[in-house]
Design a protein with these regions (language model features):
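Conserved anchor residues at repeat-unit boundaries in beta-strand-based tandem repeats, strongest
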Residues: 8-18, 32-43, 56-66, 80-91, ...
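Beta-turn initiation residues at beta-strand->coil junctions
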Residues: 1-3, 23-27, 47-51, 71-75, ...
């Protein structure tokens, strides 16, 4: 009980601290956490709830923070993230979802940001990008795809932009350009090809 006489915790105790299965409440009486405890900290499997009683997180806890496999929700049972957690942050393999439940991203995370290899999806369900990420942005080798699933670009990205060596493809899959890029623009040494992928121009681009 709090000083005001409202219930703040109900469940098992050991050495005067929450231990085992128990429920934590907000001051207004709304349930905040339901699950396992160890030495006064959320530890094991549990659920957290928002001020309106909506489910916010369901999964593993360690020393009071989400840890291991878990699911994060937004709104009324709308799944936002599903995957690995470490010390309260998205860390490891995971999936992000659009509000309608369709997959938005599948890949690696570090400290809540996309980091490592991952796939980004359109709302239609087709893959938009597959490749390397750093600090939440496309960074390193990667491939862009058009809505038909054909490769549109393959090359190097820097901070979310095409930058470095890269190849651009037509919608029919044939190679159009191969060469250097700078911040999304063809820049430097490059070559243009016709639909039969025969060289038609080579030189500098600005």
């Amino acid at each position: 009980l709090s000083k005001e006489g409202t219930l703040v915790y109900q469940g098992g105790f050991e050495s005067g601290k929450p231990h085992g299965s128990g429920t934590e409440f907000r001051k207004d009486g709304q349930k905040f956490y339901q699950g396992n405890w160890q030495a006064g900290l959320k530890h094991g499997n549990g659920k957290t709830f928002g001020p309106k009683g909506n489910l916010m997180y369901e999964g593993g806890f360690q020393q009071g923070k989400p840890h291991g496999q878990g699911q994060e929700y937004r709104g009324e049972k709308v799944l936002f993230y599903q995957g690995e957690w470490k010390n309260g942050k998205k860390d490891g393999s995971g999936k992000l979802y659009f509000p309608d439940g369709k997959l938005a991203y599948e890949g690696q995370f570090v400290s809540n940001q996309r980091e490592g290899n991952g796939k980004e999806f359109r709302k239609s369900g087709t893959v938009y990008y597959e490749g390397s990420w750093q600090k939440g942005k496309k960074n390193g080798p990667g491939t862009l795809f058009n809505s038909d699933g054909q490769k549109a670009f393959s090359g190097v990205f820097v901070k979310g932009k095409r930058d470095g060596q890269g190849k651009e493809y037509r919608k029919d899959g044939s190679l159009y350009y191969a060469g250097e890029w700078r911040e999304e623009i063809k820049h430097g040494q490059g070559a243009i090809y016709n639909k039969k992928e025969q060289l038609v121009y080579t030189g500098q681009f600005r």
